[in-house]
Each structure stands twice: as structure tokens, then as C-alpha cells.
Design a protein with these regions (language model features):
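Bacterial N-terminal signal peptides that target proteins for export
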Residues: 1-9
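Short linear motifs centered on Gly/Pro in flexible linkers and helix caps
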Residues: 19-20, 223
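Glycine-centered loop/turn positions within well-structured domains
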Residues: 3-4, 48, 132, 314-315
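Active-site-adjacent loops and short helices of periplasmic peptidoglycan-processing enzymes
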Residues: 21-182, 188-193
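Bacterial N-terminal signal peptides
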Residues: 8-17
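A generic structural signal for short, solvent-exposed coil/turn residues
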Residues: 13, 31-33, 80-82, 102, ...
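Domain-terminus/edge residues, biased toward the C-terminal soluble/receptor-binding domains
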Residues: 161-165, 173-316
Length: 316
């Protein structure tokens, strides 16, 4: 049987909004060689970094920006400011034909005057990576793109993302916009934890809207051996090819971030390499708190009917 390293999980859970530092393991495990500008492999349960390269390097996130766009929308839903069933009237600023910056970019293909639910716009943002869907949501939630970007950056601070600043709601190249593999892993962890009603959308393989069917660009969703259920791809000329993939193996979830790969296939291969390595070399185990009761067991023919179970409290 192959030896594994164990990631300790305390019963005293830490907040997902905390920033976690990379950890050195006491046992030498050779990480895979990754062909990308930067990368991170994170254990979801603990937030522990299993391997990383240039993880704090500020890079263009491209459409990985949309993870924060979706996160802000979900926070607005959680605070009851909007609902998934709200109907949004699409404005001209979300129309690709009227916005040259959208030429050649990913779209949901909205038109001015379209009436679309927040739920469908969220699906268009996640599955189609629709820049127009991002603008429509930003207008509805915050009254405009600049106001929405301000909200995005407020959550950057709340999540302690030290390497991140946003200038757009969609991720197209813009001066001053940057993030890191580490920060995007932390954001992905927050999304998985905090958006149970939305996260299933990240595994949706296609979306048909207005008679147009588009495939999710995350090719790992089709790999039946990996159990990948999200999260997002991104690409611009300045960013290269980015991918965040999360996979579940038994009770363990891993998050792989790859930034600046050289092709769509390359980003998938590098993310898969990280996930396979983590699954083969690590297990997550729970460390019980000293003196903490974790259950009871019935006793037959004893002087007590049951006994409490848990670690023995030690001293010194």
C-alpha cells in the first residue's frame, strides 16, 4: 500500500475567510513538475497548501474574475437584497454589439430589453463565462459596473486576498487588475463553502439560451475518473490559459489553481496532474480535541448502561 501524508483537521474549525499560509511537511514528498506561470494545490477542509509555485505572483486573472462577480451576487442574495427569481431587464451596456470591448470574447448573447432571471444570468456567468451576463448582474445589484467593482474589492479585503485587485466585473484585460493562484484558491474555497445553492452550477456542462447552446470550457468536467465539479476557466492574451478545478475523492476535496498555461489542453493537464498527486499522496484525518466527548457506547451486563467515548484528557 502506498504511504500517504495525513492532513490533520481539528474539531475547532477555522473560518473560511481566513488566509492560510503554505505549510512545509515533515516527510519529503516530491511534488509534480507543473508547466504554468503559477499554481496552487489546496486541501479544501483545512485550507492547507499541499504544493505551490509562484503562488503569490500577481497575474491577470482573466475570466477567473467572474468567481468574485458570482460571489458578490450570492452575498446580495444572502442579505435578501435580491433573489434568484428576480427579473433583470438587460441594458445596452450589456449588449455585445454596442460594446467593442466584447468583440471576440465569451458571451451569453443577451440583447437590450431581454428580461432574464438572476438565476439564469448566474448560469450564463458560470457556464458560458458571459461578459454580458456579468454587466447585467452588476447593473442590477449595484446600479453600475464601477459600484459593483467597489463591492468586489470590499470582499477582497474581507477575504484577506493580499495579491488581488479588480478593475472590471468580467476579467477582460485592464491596467491594475491582478490576482494570484493563492488568492484564487482562497476565493474558490469560500465559494464552495458559502454558496451551496449556487455551486452545483459550476459542474453544469452546457447551457442553452436564446436558441444557442454553449459548452462549459472546463474540460475536466467530462473526465469521469476525477470527480471534478468546478470551478472556472479564463483566458486573455495577457493572462494565458487559467483554470481552477476542484475534485472530490471520498471525503476529501482538493482545489487546484493553474495560471498562465500555454493552451486550453495544457491547463487541464497541469490541473489534473496536481489533483492526481494530491489524491495519491494525502489523506485528511480528524484530530479529536483532548477530553472531548464524541459519542457514547452501550455496555451489556456492566454496572453502567453506557460509557462516554473520546480521547483521554492528558496533563503536561
Amino acid at each position: 500500500m502506498k504511504g500517504r501524508l495525513f492532513i490533520a483537521v481539528s474539531l475547532l474549525a477555522a473560518s473560511v475567510s481566513c488566509a492560510f499560509a503554505a505549510n512545509d511537511f515533515p516527510v519529503n514528498v516530491t511534488p509534480p513538475s507543473i508547466q504554468a506561470g503559477s499554481w496552487v494545490l489546496m486541501d479544501y477542509t483545512t485550507g492547507q497548501i499541499l504544493t505551490a509555485g509562484n503562488e503569490h505572483q500577481q497575474r491577470n486573472p482573466a475570466s477567473l474574475t467572474k468567481l468574485m462577480t458570482g460571489y458578490v451576487v450570492d452575498r446580495a442574495i444572502d442579505s435578501h437584497r435580491i433573489t434568484f427569481d428576480d427579473i433583470v431587464t438587460v441594458g445596452k451596456d450589456a449588449w455585445a454589439q454596442g460594446n467593442p470591448v466584447f468583440n471576440g470574447s465569451s458571451l451569453m448573447f443577451l440583447k437590450p430589453g431581454d428580461r432574464v432571471s438572476v438565476r439564469d444570468l448566474s448560469r450564463g456567468l458560470i457556464v458560458d463565462s458571459g461578459n454580458d451576463a456579468c454587466v447585467a448582474l452588476a447593473d442590477y445589484v449595484a446600479g453600475g459596473q464601477p459600484q459593483f467593482v467597489a463591492l468586489m474589492n470590499s470582499y477582497v479585503e474581507k477575504l484577506h486576498l493580499q495579491d488581488t485587485h479588480f478593475e472590471t466585473v468580467h476579467g477582460l484585460d485592464a491596467p491594475g487588475q491582478h490576482s494570484s493562484a493563492y488568492d484564487l484558491a482562497v476565493l474558490s474555497r469560500a465559494i464552495i463553502h458559502g454558496e451551496p445553492d449556487v455551486y452545483h452550477m459550476y459542474s453544469q456542462k452546457s447551457l442553452t439560451w436564446n436558441g444557442i447552446t454553449q459548452q462549459n470550457r472546463n474540460g475536466l468536467l467530462w473526465d469521469k475518473t476525477m470527480n471534478v465539479d468546478g470551478l472556472k476557466t479564463g483566458h486573455t492574451s495577457g493572462a494565458g490559459f487559467n483554470l481552477i478545478a476542484s475534485a472530490v475523492d471520498g471525503q476529501r476535496r482538493l482545489i487546484a489553481v493553474v495560471m498562465g498555461a500555454d493552451s486550453p489542453k495544457g491547463r487541464e493537464q497541469q490541473a489534473a496532474k496536481l489533483l492526481h498527486w494530491g489524491q495519491q499522496n494525502f489523506d485528511t484525518v480528524q484530530v479529536l480535541q483532548d477530553g472531548k466527548q464524541v459519542g457514547v457506547e452501550r455496555i451489556w451486563y456492566g454496572d453502567k448502561e453506557q460509557i462516554k467515548l473520546g480521547p483521554i484528557r492528558t496533563s503536561g
